[in-house]
């Protein structure tokens, strides 16, 4: 019988057939293997309800049953998804006919009930035996029942007479969650970023490192032929990195942050060449004030700007307007030109120009450059003179930060902020300008931080640059090596370069002035910032900080080169170099250091264990240094050199406080010397207060101290209990006095306030116009009427002398110099003082304790004793110097205590701290007679 003709057939049955026929049917089906005999289990359900025998099912009915089985979407026939091989299923096993293991009734044959499932022959991907069914049919999955897994129909489907469908899809199984894929990709992306960021030198090390396998592949998603080990970093990323490294650099776009910031900075720097032009004065005033700046300011406070370069650029019009405005603002106070003069005080003349320059500088704090830094330093000095303590303090701090941002504290050969990348070597003048700007910041920090509660910011060991060279070397551009602040020589000269072997000869006034101010900063830190209390050793011991500072001050003056030691010849040499004021200012600072250290030791007399010799030496050094400062100020006045540095005024103030004690001495030589020196200091302070506003306060402080001296002499109180309470007025304390400027009433001279009489008081008694000496000192700002006719008739010689002594107008002298008061005031003061206090006046002329006319003591030069009891120079050549007091100003009987002591002066000086036994000799035949 040819079975090839039966391509498709189905069987129908009524009930269970006999076992013999069923066995024969099974044998028959086993022998029948048609190539097209794929199981068509959809037709079985239709056969169960039809009454047709096997082999009689029409073809049309079969097709209808097949179409009906596809009505439900979940009951599609697997015939369309069957493999191409009709004899194998999707697991690679040969399909068996429906009668192979299960009878038509749905019950398996008893002899094959324990047969091994067909899917057990499959192996897992790892090559192990499969123990679980790989895929269940759709019906078993819906009913949550165990599927036997036979093909073409499982036991459950045969038993239930339902189609058995194994749903096989071509879509790969997705991971349980998307987070697994995300975690797998994240390390790869991080690895790519790291490889892009590493440098070329580190790629060789990374090439030998194998990239880790973060997560194994999901079963069924990776072909078996792909290796499980990943490639190395060099193999995976080597070609890409090589191409990236050799690729040409891309041009920067306009939106790049770095390039945009650079363009903004360049634009701001370009604006400096024209911003502020509208506020500039005329060209004539610019050149005039530039000369005034270099004559009165340059070198005395800071060594800023190179004069030849500045003047050349000024004439060519290539200077930034902000720099010109700054120079004009600070120099306007010293000019006498009618084009610059104003109705206000001299120290406020340049405020209009300073305000424009200040606005320009404060808007550019983000972009540091040397021009803005120089302007900040000069503006800080100007605000110092206008008593704007807050502004000066802030501008100084901003300048210091900007200097460190520009790396001026390092001695570099190239500009570190050069944006061109060319690294052009700096010239000697440019390097010296950078050094001097940094030293100016250092000095400003010392000046501004000298107060009690103002610590210093810049440490000495931070400045790693040489000290400035001599001024003539700087002006002519002659390079020369110098020492650093600690004495080291960074660039020692070689024998064959033609330079001076001794580097100290290359150091001028600027270098030793910096060292003097540095030592002064250490002393103020020791005295006013708590270091004195932390010293474990007493002041008089050699290991104490006090003795160390004293030795440093003395040795610094002794270590000056011969060309810088004070002498008349060296002063003339410095006049030829246009640096006499700088030379005098340096020596004033050196003497002030000795005065400051020695004065602090005088308060330790009553301490336990102090020796009289220690106190005697400290007192001698204090008075000698104070007298020496007055001598230098007098030499400057006679030589026509004006020492305009504000710190020089503070040195004169400190010296004046010592002289105020010497005035009441019972030693005639000390008394006369103190009178002459105090006159010099007070005149100098009155001249300085026209240019620097804070000296109004210092002059009033000297006046108060003198009044305390008079009160102490009258009362005769015991001062030994307050001998250790000596405190000092520091240079930086004016910040607290004038944090935001001073009012008009604080700097206006009393002579400018004219008293106005109302018309209703015309018939009343006239108000008195004169005051006594006691009233003058009691009232810091006395009022008086200024009558031009009376003044001209009473004191014509005073006005003539005033014109000879100063270049300022006579009216300004009368308004600002209380030393030159009228003779009418002096007569009234004489009458009041002699009547109230019993003062015995010698001579016919009236006496004013604030000034003495040249005719008052014609024989003063012949009766003048040496200035100091310790080898002081005679004042025979100062015969016409007006004295602060007459030869015998205190020939009166003051009450004293039983112990002969006097009550305290003020918080600055304690008179008892200077008292000593009258028999104590000073070493030159003179004795103390306080």
UniProtKB/Swiss-Prot annotation:
It is found in: Nucleus. InterPro entries: TF_fung, Transcription_factor_dom_fun, Zn2-C6_fun-type_DNA-bd_sf, Zn2Cys6_DnaBD. One of its GO terms (cellular component) is nucleus. Its main location: nucleus. It holds the Pfam family Fungal_trans. Gene3D superfamilies: Zn(2)-C6 fungal-type DNA-binding domain. CDD domains: fungal_TF_MHR (cd12148), GAL4 (cd00067). Keywords: Metal-binding, Nucleus, Transcription, Transcription regulation, Virulence. GO terms for molecular function: DNA binding; DNA-binding transcription factor activity, RNA polymerase II-specific; zinc ion binding. SUPFAM superfamilies: Zn2/Cys6 DNA-binding domain (SSF57701). One of its GO terms (biological process) is DNA-templated transcription. Induction: Exclusively expressed during infection of common bean. The keyword Transcription regulation applies. Residues 137-164 bind DNA. Zn(2)-C6 fungal-type transcription factor that has a role in the establishment of the fungus within the plant and/or the progress of the disease. Regulates the expression of virulence factors such as SIX1 and SIX6. Multiple copies of the gene are present in highly virulent fusarium oxysporum strains. This is Zn(2)-C6 fungal-type transcription factor FTF1c. It comes from Fusarium oxysporum f. sp. lycopersici (strain 4287 / CBS 123668 / FGSC 9935 / NRRL 34936) (Fusarium vascular wilt of tomato). The gene is FTF1c.
């Amino acid at each position: 019988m040819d079975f090839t003709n039966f391509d498709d057939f189905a069987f129908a049955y009524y009930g269970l057939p006999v076992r013999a026929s069923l066995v024969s049917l099974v044998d028959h089906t086993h022998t029948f293997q048609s190539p097209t005999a794929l199981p068509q289990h959809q037709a079985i359900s239709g056969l169960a309800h039809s009454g047709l025998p096997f082999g009689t099912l029409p073809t049309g009915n079969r097709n209808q049953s097949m179409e009906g089985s596809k009505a439900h979407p979940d009951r599609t026939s697997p015939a369309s998804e069957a493999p191409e091989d009709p004899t194998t299923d999707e697991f690679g096993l040969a399909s068996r006919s429906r009668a192979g293991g299960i009878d038509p009734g749905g019950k398996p044959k008893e002899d094959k009930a324990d047969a091994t499932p067909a899917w057990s022959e499959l192996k897992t991907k790892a090559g192990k035996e499969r123990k679980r069914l790989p895929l269940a049919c759709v019906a078993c999955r819906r009913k949550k029942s165990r599927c036997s897994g036979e093909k073409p129909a499982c036991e459950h489907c045969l038993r239930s007479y339902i189609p058995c469908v194994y749903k096989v899809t071509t879509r790969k199984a997705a991971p349980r969650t998307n987070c697994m894929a995300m975690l797998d990709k994240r390390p790869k992306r991080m690895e790519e970023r790291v490889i892009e960021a590493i440098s070329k030198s580190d790629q060789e090390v990374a090439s030998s490192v194998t990239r880790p396998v973060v997560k194994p592949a999901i079963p069924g998603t990776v072909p078996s032929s792909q290796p499980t080990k990943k490639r190395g970093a060099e193999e995976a990323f080597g070609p890409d990195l090589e191409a990236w490294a050799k690729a040409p650099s891309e041009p920067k776009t306009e939106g790049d942050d770095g390039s945009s910031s650079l363009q903004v900075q360049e634009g701001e720097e370009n604006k400096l060449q024209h911003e502020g032009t509208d506020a500039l004065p005329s060209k004539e005033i610019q050149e005039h004030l530039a000369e005034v700046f270099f004559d009165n300011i340059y070198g005395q406070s800071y060594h800023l700007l190179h004069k030849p370069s500045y003047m050349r650029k000024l004439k060519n019009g290539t200077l930034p307007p902000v720099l010109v405005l700054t120079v004009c603002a600070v120099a306007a106070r010293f000019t006498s030109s009618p084009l610059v003069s104003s109705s206000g005080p001299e120290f406020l003349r340049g405020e209009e120009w300073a305000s424009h320059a200040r606005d320009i500088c404060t808007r550019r704090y983000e972009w540091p450059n040397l021009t803005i830094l120089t302007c900040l330093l000069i503006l800080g000095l100007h605000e110092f003179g206008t008593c704007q303590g807050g502004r000066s303090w802030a501008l100084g701090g901003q300048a210091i930060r900007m200097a460190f941002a520009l790396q001026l504290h390092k001695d570099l050969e190239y500009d570190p902020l050069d944006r061109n990348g060319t690294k052009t070597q700096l010239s000697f003048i440019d390097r010296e300008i950078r050094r001097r700007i940094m030293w100016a910041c250092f000095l400003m920090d010392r000046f501004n931080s000298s107060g009690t509660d103002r610590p210093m910011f810049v440490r000495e060991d931070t400045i790693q640059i040489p000290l400035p060279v001599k001024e003539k070397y700087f002006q002519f551009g002659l390079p020369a090596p110098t020492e650093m602040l600690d004495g080291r020589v960074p660039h020692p000269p070689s024998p064959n370069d033609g330079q001076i072997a001794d580097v100290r000869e290359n150091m001028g006034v600027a270098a030793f002035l910096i060292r003097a101010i540095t030592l002064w900063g250490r002393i103020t830190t020791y005295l006013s910032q708590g270091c004195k209390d932390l010293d474990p050793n007493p002041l008089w011991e050699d290991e104490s900080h006090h003795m160390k500072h004293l030795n440093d001050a003395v040795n610094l003056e002794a270590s000056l080169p011969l060309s810088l030691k004070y002498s008349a010849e060296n002063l003339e040499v410095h006049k030829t170099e246009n640096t006499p004021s700088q030379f005098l200012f340096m020596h004033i600072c050196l003497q002030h250091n000795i005065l400051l250290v020695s004065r602090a030791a005088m308060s330790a007399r009553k301490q336990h264990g102090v020796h009289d010799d220690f106190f005697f030496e400290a007192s001698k050094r204090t008075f000698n240094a104070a007298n020496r400062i007055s001598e230098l100020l007098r030499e400057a006045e006679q030589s026509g050199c004006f020492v305009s540095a504000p710190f020089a005024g503070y040195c004169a103030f400190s010296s004046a406080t010592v002289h105020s004690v010497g005035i009441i001495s019972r030693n005639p030589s000390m008394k006369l010397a103190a009178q002459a020196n105090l006159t010099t200091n007070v005149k100098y302070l009155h001249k300085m207060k026209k240019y620097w506003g804070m000296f109004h306060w210092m002059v009033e402080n000297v006046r108060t101290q003198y009044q305390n001296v008079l009160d102490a002499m009258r009362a005769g109180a015991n001062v030994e209990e307050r001998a250790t309470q000596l405190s000092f007025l520091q240079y930086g304390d004016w910040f607290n006095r004038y944090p935001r400027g001073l009012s008009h009433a604080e700097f206006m001279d009393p002579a400018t306030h004219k008293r106005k009489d109302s018309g209703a008081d015309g018939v009343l008694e006239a108000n008195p116009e004169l005051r006594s000496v006691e009233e003058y000192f009691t009232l810091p700002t006395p009022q008086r009427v200024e009558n031009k006719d009376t003044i001209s008739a009473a004191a014509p010689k005073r006005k003539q002398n005033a014109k000879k002594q100063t270049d300022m107008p006579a009216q300004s002298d009368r308004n600002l110099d209380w030393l030159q008061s009228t003779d009418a005031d002096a007569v009234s003061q004489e009458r009041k003082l002699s009547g109230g206090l019993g003062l015995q006046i010698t001579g016919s002329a009236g006496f004013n304790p604030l000034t003495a006319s040249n005719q008052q003591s014609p024989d003063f030069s012949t009766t003048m004793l040496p200035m100091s009891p310790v080898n002081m120079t005679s004042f025979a050549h100062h015969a016409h110097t007006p004295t602060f007091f007459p030869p015998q100003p205190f020939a009166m009987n003051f009450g004293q205590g039983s112990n002969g002591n006097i009550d305290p002066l003020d918080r600055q000086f304690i008179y008892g701290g200077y008292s000593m036994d009258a028999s104590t000799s000073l070493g030159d035949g003179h004795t103390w007679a306080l």
